Amino acid sequence: VEAILDVALELVVEQGAEALAMREVARRAGVQISSVYQYFPSKAAIIRELATRNLERVHLILEREVGDLFAEHDGRPTPAQAVNRVVDAYYAHYRDQPAAVAVWAGAQSDHGLRELDIEDSRRTAEFLVPSLMEILSLTDTQDVFALALLLAETTGAVARLALAVEAPLRDQLVAKLKVMLIATLEASQANGRAA
């Protein structure tokens, strides 16, 4: 299974998810086509597994970064510290892992896989809610969930957009994302509710 996924990932990076061919995966992995179909009944199933693995890596990075953030700031990071830490980690993952961007692009082209991305944004938001409630001193879980979902989806979209454009604009997009997110969190904190 791992050999099949490794080859599939190489092909997605080289040619894009749309061009992924099961026969080529089998050929490069050195297995019979029936072996590929035994584990993955379709190209979408391969992309789904690659996307799921990437999303799990991102979630582990996020857990580590949020834990470190709270530890380094005695449990009381500012909105700016939180945004800078999380955006930098998220962006670095996609910048340093071009395969992750290729898999994400492939997942976006399939409606069923887009649902996986939305589910992951919800999972990320659920993870962020307690931290945001602590950072912002807010108590309305549903309100903070909506804010966290917006932050998760916006961060992902802008990070991937930044990687698709040239370097000067790339840095500007990430910087402006941070300004926007910090302003949103600080406004929520000042209002006593998610803005």
PLM segments and residue spans:
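Hydrophobic alpha-helical segments that form the core
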Residues: R122-V129, T141-A162, Q172-T184
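Alpha-helical DNA-contacting segments of helix-turn-helix folds
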Residues: V12, I47-N54, D117-D120
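Short hydrophobic clusters on alpha-helical segments that form packing/core surfaces
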Residues: I4-V12, N54, V58, Y90, ...
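Hydrophobic alpha-helical bundle segments that form small-molecule/ligand-binding pockets
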Residues: F70-R76, R95-R114, R122-A148, S188-G192
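Amphipathic alpha-helical interaction segments
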Residues: A3, A45, Q81-R85, A89, ...
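Helix-turn-helix
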Residues: A3, V7, L11-A45, E49
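Hydrophobic alpha-helical connector segments
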Residues: E49, R64-R95, L151
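Residues in soluble alpha-helical coiled-coils and helical-bundle/repeat scaffolds
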Residues: P41-A45, E49, D74, R95, ...
